[in-house]
Amino acid sequence: MMLEASLRVIASRGHEVTLLDAAKLHVVQNLSCYAGGGRNCASPDAGPYRCWAHKNSVDDPAKYGGEDEMPVIYDGIADADVVLWATSVRWMSHSSLLQRLIERMNTLENRASVYGEANPLAGKLAGVIVAGQHYEGQKVAICLQETFIRLGFTVPLDAQMVWQRTLDLNLEQGDGSNRPHVGLHLVSPAGRGQITRFVEALGL
């Protein structure tokens, strides 16, 4: 809901938006490509996307549960000026799905750090959206911002939007003392203000 609300505001300001749902894609697990001196990841021999996980799944889809669809994400990033990453909080961390995407972006960062080429992520802005019942969503957002900076994105300090329903780390179920549902928050003055600050931090 937070991502969709942000995209609506961005679109209303005249920007083209595209929503990619990685949960609907078959993204193969990252491989250990750092053998052989650490130059296997992003090798030009690893196909057009320079990713062995993708190339191997194309060569032998049965072994990998089907052909890898990470190129949908790669191409989406390549076409974008700004990328928003959204995740739930899982045990004080981001989701395993987002972690898989982060690991699969090694091939982009390694083109610069290993092969001395231009980083395809350089100059692209990124923002982070984090939602959870509790478990310190703010810390998850900050960690993700640092991760995307290391990958090569430009991440403004205020380009994060966090929803954490309760500050009580021991509260597993909702009760009347919790904050309102996120949907109610997003249409409130406070929620609209939060979206505006997030979007404007990205220059949108």
Where does each model-flagged region fall?
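N-terminal beta-loop-helix "entrance" segment that forms/cooperates
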Residues: 18-49, 54-58, 168-176
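Helix-loop-strand module that forms the ligand-binding subsite of alpha/beta enzymes
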Residues: 47-50, 55-151
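A generic structural motif
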Residues: 12-18, 153-154
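Glycine-rich phosphate/pyrophosphate-binding loop and the adjoining helix
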Residues: 149-204
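Residue-level "edge-of-site" marker
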Residues: 23, 90, 161
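N-terminal beta1-alpha1 ligand-phosphate binding loop
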Residues: 1-13
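Hydrophobic/aromatic beta-strand patches that form the interior of the parallel beta-sheet core
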Residues: 18-20, 84, 127-130, 159-162
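Hydrophobic alpha-helical membrane-association signature
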Residues: 1-2, 101, 140, 191-194, ...
